[in-house]
Amino acid sequence: MSTHDPISDLITRIRNAQMRSKPKVSTPGSKMRANVLEVLKSEGYIRGYASVEHSSGRSELEIELKYFDGEPVIREIERVSRPGRRVYASVKNLPRVNNGLGISVLSTPKGIMADHEARDANVGGEVLFTVF
């Protein structure tokens, strides 16, 4: 099944799996999703992910979710820029999530990265979603 917004699909799968306290969740594989998951892993919001190849030739990403004292590490995950309403921010206007306790994930000319990495690299871009 094709989705029109793969980032929203990924966010929804993670949110739903954490509400049910699932240890893992899978999603169709793509480079963009893998890059987003790499940012979430480096920031400590997920344990990890692995690419799984099926005999039919399609790949899936198996995401290992992270919990602390039985509660999901991700308290809120919210889509900001959508296909119908793109949200861009310059390096000066990058949003701070909960006074710096959360992160914004951006798509920049230098790749997908967290907001603090974008500030360090002095680049702006499309604000994909926020995590707290």
Curated annotation (Swiss-Prot):
Keywords: Ribonucleoprotein, Ribosomal protein, RNA-binding, rRNA-binding. One of its GO terms (cellular component) is ribonucleoprotein complex. Signal peptide: none annotated. The keyword Cytoplasm does not apply. One of its GO terms (molecular function) is structural constituent of ribosome. It comes from the Bacteria. One of its GO terms (biological process) is translation. Pfam families: Ribosomal_S8. SUPFAM superfamilies: Ribosomal protein S8. The keyword Iron-sulfur does not apply. Part of the 30S ribosomal subunit. Contacts proteins S5 and S12. One of the primary rRNA binding proteins, it binds directly to 16S rRNA central domain where it helps coordinate assembly of the platform of the 30S subunit. Belongs to the universal ribosomal protein uS8 family. This is Small ribosomal subunit protein uS8. It comes from Nitrobacter winogradskyi (strain ATCC 25391 / DSM 10237 / CIP 104748 / NCIMB 11846 / Nb-255).
